[in-house]
From Swiss-Prot:
Pfam families: GlutR_dimer, GlutR_N, Shikimate_DH. The gene is hemA. It comes from the Bacteria. This is Glutamyl-tRNA reductase. Keywords: NADP, Oxidoreductase, Porphyrin biosynthesis. Its EC number is 1.2.1.70. It is an enzyme of class 1 (oxidoreductase). Residues 410-432 are annotated as: Disordered. NADP(+) binds at residues 181-186. During catalysis, the active site Cys acts as a nucleophile attacking the alpha-carbonyl group of tRNA-bound glutamate with the formation of a thioester intermediate between enzyme and glutamate, and the concomitant release of tRNA(Glu). The thioester intermediate is finally reduced by direct hydride transfer from NADPH, to form the product GSA. One of its GO terms (molecular function) is glutamyl-tRNA reductase activity. PANTHER family: GLUTAMYL-TRNA REDUCTASE (PTHR43013:SF1). Catalyzes the NADPH-dependent reduction of glutamyl-tRNA(Glu) to glutamate 1-semialdehyde (GSA). Homodimer.
Length: 432
């Protein structure tokens, strides 16, 4: 089996394609159920965020994964990257650490990777390989963030958006802010806004209890999502990040809000994929709409300031990739060693039981011991001897050289066991 990663992100695909590629809401568990039924796919996990959609799988057939992706999210082939084995391990480590993020070093992605791992476990698509890989990525991310400055003054898309809002509406203590959603992105935005002492904070969410909890934490007011349009006109700044499959803030609703506000400007941040706010809102006079792709330009300064820390983190990841692959290789070699030991102990126990039975029946001990010795020799060495003969006939020099390393011939010395075995296997039934 081979480890594969297929995906696209903000570097390979524009927002319109990332929107089409995403698995949000019920689409994610349905996709995992579908992957579980694919032949030759042992394990799978899906990571779907506003900036990336990635499929992690252990399979012998990468083309099957491409076909599955084309069936469920058509038209992405020219924007996909593919990583295999060590490259796949390296990619996940970089993603979890924040080195592959739009905001270099942002911490939110680690929580999203953990959510992906948890969802795959819940739906039975995670086995030992991916489980071990994902958990190791958590450790690598923690190590990199602890031992470099990549995590200093944590930055996220949410914090970048709040900083832009502060620049546009300074001070925030004279502004009303409306948050739509209650997920991690909105939670981060609420935290940064409360630190900026926003005058009034409104939180609308489909699950009202979650909105109430978030509002109580940050001194805000909770609204049912069904009343959203009634409060749009109150907001100077709007942040939206839900998992809705279609936009929930429309051009007509914002136009109505601007009319009520007597054309007082509204600043809107759409932090969702798929988008929460209709693109046409950005064409309205006095409505200023920023999307995730717009924020990429704003975070470029952060990327440069963290470059040195990122280089150190990259070195840590390279070391961790090597260690992880070395461990996998060692574990792969353990399997034949375990089979060899099992074969040896099973053969020993079987022939020893037969010998004891013969002794109990009064057969001479010398005769029983001799038969036991010959039986062990034949049983244990017949398979490798037969394999070496076939290798010699097929000119498989690699296997022959391996045998020479296992049984080196010293000057003037012939390995008695090997010599005896070859003679005996010619003359004796190996099952005797």
């Amino acid at each position: 089996m081979t480890l594969w990663v297929l995906g696209l992100n903000h570097q390979t695909a524009p927002m319109e394609l990332r929107e089409r590629a995403s698995f949000v809401g019920d689409a994610l568990p349905r996709a995992l159920d579908s992957l579980r039924n694919l032949p030759n796919v042992n394990e799978a996990a899906l990571l779907s965020t506003c900036n990336r959609t990635e499929l992690y799988a252990e399979t012998t057939n990468a083309q099957m994964l491409l076909n599955w992706l084309e069936q469920h999210r058509p038209g992405l082939q020219n924007h996909l990257y593919q990583y295999r084995d060590a490259a796949a391990v390296r990619h996940l480590f970089r993603v979890a650490t924040g080195l592959d993020s739009m905001v270099l070093g942002e911490s939110q992605i680690l929580g999203q990777v953990k959510d992906s791992w948890s969802m795959a476990r819940t739906h039975g698509t995670l086995g030992n390989t991916l489980d071990r890989l994902f958990q190791h990525s958590f450790s690598v991310a923690k190590h990199a963030r602890t031992n470099t400055r990549i995590g200093t003054n944590p930055v996220s898309i949410a914090s970048t958006a709040v900083r832009l809002a502060q620049d546009a509406f300074s001070p925030l203590n004279e502004s009303t802010v409306l948050l739509i959603g209650a997920g991690e992105t909105i939670q981060l935005a609420a935290k940064h806004l409360s630190e900026g002492r926003v005058q009034r904070l409104l939180i609308a969410n489909r699950t009202h209890a979650k909105a109430q909890m978030l509002a109580s934490q940050h001194g805000g007011y909770a609204l049912p999502l069904t009343e959203l349009n009634l409060h749009l006109a109150e907001a100077d700044i709007i942040f939206s990040a839900t998992a809705a499959p279609t936009p929930i803030v429309t051009q007509s609703n914002v136009e109505s809000a601007l009319h009520i506000r007597k054309r007082k400007p509204i600043l809107l941040f759409d932090l969702a994929i798929p988008r929460d706010i209709e693109t046409e809102v950005g064409t309205l006079t006095d409505a200023y709409l920023y999307t995730i792709d717009d924020l990429e330009r704003a975070v470029e300064e952060n990327r440069h300031s963290r470059r040195e820390a990122a280089e150190t983190a990259e070195a840590i990841i390279e070391l961790q990739v090597k260690r992880y692959m070395d461990t996998l290789q060692a574990q792969a070699h353990q399997a034949p060693l375990r089979r060899l030991r099992t074969f040896g102990t099973t053969t020993r126990d079987e022939l020893l039981t037969r010998a004891r039975r013969q002794l109990a029946n009064g057969r001479p001990a010398e005769e029983v011991l001799e038969q036991l010795a010959h039986g062990l020799t034949n049983r244990l060495l017949h398979p490798p001897t037969a394999a070496l003969r076939e290798a010699a006939l097929a000119n498989n020099t690699e296997l022959v050289r391996a045998a020479e390393q296992l049984f080196p011939e010293k000057p003037g010395y012939h390995h008695p066991t090997l010599q005896t075995t070859i003679v005996k296997t010619d003359e004796t039934d190996p099952a005797s």
